[in-house]
Amino acid sequence: MVLGMSLQTFTFVHVLLSLMGIGSGFIVVFGLLSSKRLNGWTLLFLVTTVLTSATGFLFPVERLLPSHIVAILSLVALTIAILARYRFHMAGAWRTTYVVGAVIALYFNCFVGVVQAFEKVPTLKALAPTQKEPPFLVAQLVVLAIFVALGIIAARRFRSVSMLPA
Protein backbone atom coordinates (compact mmCIF):
# COMPACT_ATOMS: atom_id res chain seq x y z
CA MET A 1 0.00 0.00 0.00
CA VAL A 2 1.16 3.48 -0.92
CA LEU A 3 -0.87 6.47 0.29
CA GLY A 4 -3.74 4.08 1.00
CA MET A 5 -3.68 2.68 -2.55
CA SER A 6 -2.58 -0.70 -3.82
CA LEU A 7 0.77 -0.57 -5.59
CA GLN A 8 -1.04 -1.16 -8.89
CA THR A 9 -3.42 1.77 -8.32
CA PHE A 10 -0.59 4.02 -7.12
CA THR A 11 1.45 3.14 -10.22
CA PHE A 12 -1.56 3.98 -12.41
CA VAL A 13 -1.95 7.38 -10.69
CA HIS A 14 1.79 8.07 -11.04
CA VAL A 15 1.75 7.19 -14.76
CA LEU A 16 -1.41 9.24 -15.32
CA LEU A 17 0.21 12.27 -13.66
CA SER A 18 3.29 11.77 -15.81
CA LEU A 19 1.29 11.57 -19.04
CA MET A 20 -0.73 14.64 -18.04
CA GLY A 21 2.53 16.47 -17.32
CA ILE A 22 4.00 15.49 -20.68
CA GLY A 23 0.87 16.37 -22.64
CA SER A 24 0.29 19.70 -20.94
CA GLY A 25 4.03 20.40 -21.04
CA PHE A 26 4.11 20.15 -24.82
CA ILE A 27 1.13 22.50 -25.03
CA VAL A 28 2.99 24.96 -22.75
CA VAL A 29 6.19 24.73 -24.82
CA PHE A 30 4.28 25.34 -28.05
CA GLY A 31 2.67 28.31 -26.29
CA LEU A 32 6.13 29.60 -25.43
CA LEU A 33 7.13 29.26 -29.08
CA SER A 34 4.29 31.63 -30.02
CA SER A 35 4.79 33.92 -26.99
CA LYS A 36 1.60 32.82 -25.24
CA ARG A 37 1.42 32.36 -21.48
CA LEU A 38 -1.31 29.68 -21.43
CA ASN A 39 -1.80 30.14 -17.68
CA GLY A 40 -4.15 27.20 -17.11
CA TRP A 41 -2.05 24.75 -19.09
CA THR A 42 1.08 26.01 -17.35
CA LEU A 43 -0.41 25.43 -13.92
CA LEU A 44 -1.53 21.93 -14.94
CA PHE A 45 1.94 21.17 -16.34
CA LEU A 46 3.81 22.41 -13.29
CA VAL A 47 1.53 20.72 -10.74
CA THR A 48 1.39 17.34 -12.51
CA THR A 49 5.13 17.34 -13.17
CA VAL A 50 5.94 18.18 -9.54
CA LEU A 51 3.56 15.42 -8.43
CA THR A 52 5.11 12.97 -10.89
CA SER A 53 8.59 13.61 -9.49
CA ALA A 54 7.42 13.57 -5.88
CA THR A 55 5.37 10.38 -6.16
CA GLY A 56 8.34 8.63 -7.74
CA PHE A 57 9.99 8.64 -4.32
CA LEU A 58 7.09 6.75 -2.75
CA PHE A 59 7.59 3.50 -4.63
CA PRO A 60 8.92 0.78 -2.32
CA VAL A 61 12.61 0.43 -3.18
CA GLU A 62 15.63 -0.34 -1.04
CA ARG A 63 18.16 2.02 -2.58
CA LEU A 64 18.53 5.26 -4.49
CA LEU A 65 17.82 4.61 -8.17
CA PRO A 66 18.73 6.60 -11.29
CA SER A 67 15.05 7.57 -11.53
CA HIS A 68 15.37 9.25 -8.13
CA ILE A 69 18.33 11.30 -9.36
CA VAL A 70 16.29 12.40 -12.39
CA ALA A 71 13.38 13.27 -10.08
CA ILE A 72 15.65 15.38 -7.88
CA LEU A 73 17.01 17.22 -10.92
CA SER A 74 13.48 17.70 -12.22
CA LEU A 75 12.31 19.12 -8.89
CA VAL A 76 15.23 21.57 -8.91
CA ALA A 77 14.32 22.70 -12.45
CA LEU A 78 10.65 22.94 -11.47
CA THR A 79 11.43 24.97 -8.35
CA ILE A 80 13.43 27.43 -10.41
CA ALA A 81 10.72 27.62 -13.09
CA ILE A 82 7.96 28.13 -10.51
CA LEU A 83 9.92 30.86 -8.73
CA ALA A 84 10.76 32.56 -12.03
CA ARG A 85 7.13 32.50 -13.14
CA TYR A 86 5.16 33.17 -9.97
CA ARG A 87 7.55 34.90 -7.57
CA PHE A 88 9.63 36.95 -9.99
CA HIS A 89 6.88 37.30 -12.64
CA MET A 90 9.32 36.52 -15.45
CA ALA A 91 10.87 39.98 -15.17
CA GLY A 92 14.14 40.46 -17.02
CA ALA A 93 16.34 37.37 -16.99
CA TRP A 94 13.65 35.45 -15.09
CA ARG A 95 11.78 35.09 -18.38
CA THR A 96 14.54 32.99 -19.88
CA THR A 97 15.08 31.23 -16.55
CA TYR A 98 11.42 30.20 -16.53
CA VAL A 99 11.55 28.91 -20.12
CA VAL A 100 14.73 26.92 -19.54
CA GLY A 101 13.46 25.45 -16.25
CA ALA A 102 10.12 24.44 -17.77
CA VAL A 103 11.72 22.86 -20.84
CA ILE A 104 14.26 20.98 -18.72
CA ALA A 105 11.49 19.63 -16.45
CA LEU A 106 9.51 18.44 -19.49
CA TYR A 107 12.68 16.87 -20.92
CA PHE A 108 13.29 14.91 -17.72
CA ASN A 109 9.71 13.62 -17.78
CA CYS A 110 10.14 12.53 -21.42
CA PHE A 111 13.57 11.04 -20.67
CA VAL A 112 11.98 8.79 -18.06
CA GLY A 113 9.16 8.05 -20.51
CA VAL A 114 11.68 6.73 -23.02
CA VAL A 115 13.32 4.62 -20.30
CA GLN A 116 9.93 3.19 -19.34
CA ALA A 117 9.03 2.52 -22.98
CA PHE A 118 12.25 0.53 -23.46
CA GLU A 119 11.49 -1.41 -20.26
CA LYS A 120 7.81 -2.12 -20.90
CA VAL A 121 7.22 -2.29 -24.69
CA PRO A 122 8.32 -5.77 -25.86
CA THR A 123 9.61 -4.61 -29.26
CA LEU A 124 11.73 -1.86 -27.70
CA LYS A 125 12.89 -4.17 -24.90
CA ALA A 126 14.10 -6.64 -27.56
CA LEU A 127 16.06 -3.85 -29.28
CA ALA A 128 17.77 -2.72 -26.08
CA PRO A 129 17.37 -5.26 -23.26
CA THR A 130 19.93 -3.57 -20.98
CA GLN A 131 19.34 -0.01 -22.22
CA LYS A 132 23.00 0.23 -23.15
CA GLU A 133 22.44 -0.73 -26.78
CA PRO A 134 22.55 1.76 -29.70
CA PRO A 135 18.75 1.97 -30.25
CA PHE A 136 18.23 3.20 -26.68
CA LEU A 137 21.12 5.64 -26.87
CA VAL A 138 19.96 6.98 -30.24
CA ALA A 139 16.41 7.44 -28.93
CA GLN A 140 17.66 9.37 -25.91
CA LEU A 141 19.99 11.51 -28.03
CA VAL A 142 17.14 12.36 -30.41
CA VAL A 143 14.93 13.34 -27.46
CA LEU A 144 17.75 15.46 -26.01
CA ALA A 145 18.39 17.17 -29.37
CA ILE A 146 14.70 17.97 -29.76
CA PHE A 147 14.53 19.53 -26.31
CA VAL A 148 17.73 21.53 -26.74
CA ALA A 149 16.30 22.94 -29.98
CA LEU A 150 12.88 23.61 -28.42
CA GLY A 151 14.51 25.28 -25.42
CA ILE A 152 16.69 27.58 -27.51
CA ILE A 153 13.85 28.56 -29.84
CA ALA A 154 11.37 29.04 -26.97
CA ALA A 155 13.83 31.20 -25.02
CA ARG A 156 14.29 33.42 -28.07
CA ARG A 157 10.61 33.68 -28.97
CA PHE A 158 8.90 33.95 -25.59
CA ARG A 159 8.53 37.59 -24.65
CA SER A 160 6.91 38.34 -21.31
CA VAL A 161 6.53 42.05 -22.07
CA SER A 162 4.58 41.61 -25.28
CA MET A 163 2.75 38.39 -24.53
CA LEU A 164 -0.48 37.61 -26.24
CA PRO A 165 -3.49 36.79 -24.06
CA ALA A 166 -3.72 33.25 -22.73
Residue ranges and their predicted role:
Residues V2-A166:
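Polytopic transmembrane helical bundles with strong interfacial aromatic enrichment
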